[in-house]
A protein has these predicted regions:
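RNA-contacting regions in translation and RNA-metabolism proteins
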Residues: 1-49, 62, 66-84
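Glycine-centered tight-turn and secondary-structure capping sites
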Residues: 53-57
Length: 84
């Protein structure tokens, strides 16, 4: 895993972990795609999904914005998805 991919995964984890009640269930899988972008999959306990999404999706939008901003210096696209 590239250093930037690891940094983005760590950033996403550091933002989500304090939001949830079941941090042991947090799984983050970050990988670089063929086109050079970074894809981050986030899995949390069912009970915590609403906290990560936030009202009207504001929390997950903010997490995506932070991840994209962190990668903007290298013009790398980042996509963060919350999976069931």
């Amino acid at each position: 895993m590239a250093a930037q991919t690891e940094e983005i995964a760590g950033l996403v984890e550091s933002v989500i972990r304090p939001l949830i009640d079941n941090p042991d269930d947090l799984v983050i899988d970050a990988r670089e795609t063929e086109d050079g972008s970074i894809f981050v999959e986030v899995r949390v306990n069912e009970e915590d999904a609403g906290k990560v999404i936030g009202r009207q999706g504001r929390a997950i939008k903010a997490i995506r914005t932070l991840a994209r901003a962190a990668a903007s210096s290298t013009n790398t696209h980042v996509d963060v998805e919350l999976l069931d």
